[in-house]
Amino acid sequence: QGVAVQFCLPKTAWPPTSLWQRFDKAAAAWQPRTAIAVLDKIIVRATAEKAYGHLVKAQIARGGLTIQISPDSLDAVAAQMAAEEQRAKSPVLRAVYATALGKLYAMQQRGINRKAYQQKSRDCFARALKDPDLLAKTQAKTYEPAVERRDMSKAFGGDLLHVVAGEAKEYGLLNRYYEAHGNRRAACLAACLDLRENHSDWLYTRSGKQHYQHAIDSLINVYQDLDECGELAIDHYEAMDEDAKDIVERRIRYIDWAIAKWGAWPRMNILRNKRTDLTAPQFNISLQERQMLPGKERKIHIN
């Protein structure tokens, strides 16, 4: 059972990129023992030089490869990572290890122990998030777990809190924290992500889409003075009723309205591209018969 964890590393990355290139090459060729040997070198150097982002990345990659080689080794890998968490003297580093361990457990979606692992994952994330003030004061550039939408990171101030909470899918916590501390831009995005994470299943039915739209519109009323509200507008568009008779006209009107209000939000190009698609020339072709035989003429009606 494989574990794949993506990390975003700074351009001035330590250790030398050649080590990670050697790891990538070995992993791509499915030479796990060679890849683990390279990771061990990275772990030793990262530990000595306190390059924590690379250290965590290497530890998780090593654990993932070990589990791929021996699927029954998850508990041993997790125990080793938990020991690293306990040995860490920095509370920030302990939070990062707890996050990594929580992610490792969270990715175990199969097997009879799935529910137990999910609970362990929640426990790890709870440890990681027990001091949100500390995480909010720590810049994430030293610790580089992947963020689902890195273009949102600026609003979050580049802090470690949004990285850890994002991995834990605790967007509601983020929304409440940022609201309480006056960062409405981050609170808006956190509310949007929380809605996506917990209520995306509403989008599968017409009535559910209506509930989703109402929830989005409530958030828009709160955050409409912010450019970040454009992210909510994107979700509103995606939830529009596809079966409405005038859906194309309604969508175009909504896009124009949203762009006029929040056009500065970088991801509004999504709606601009949607508008281009909606207004592109279209035609329909109808065939009188379902089967077409070679060498036999058929009439094609183009509307």
Each language-model region and where it sits:
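Bacterial Sec-dependent signal peptides at the C-terminal "C-region" and cleavage site
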Residues: Q1-P15
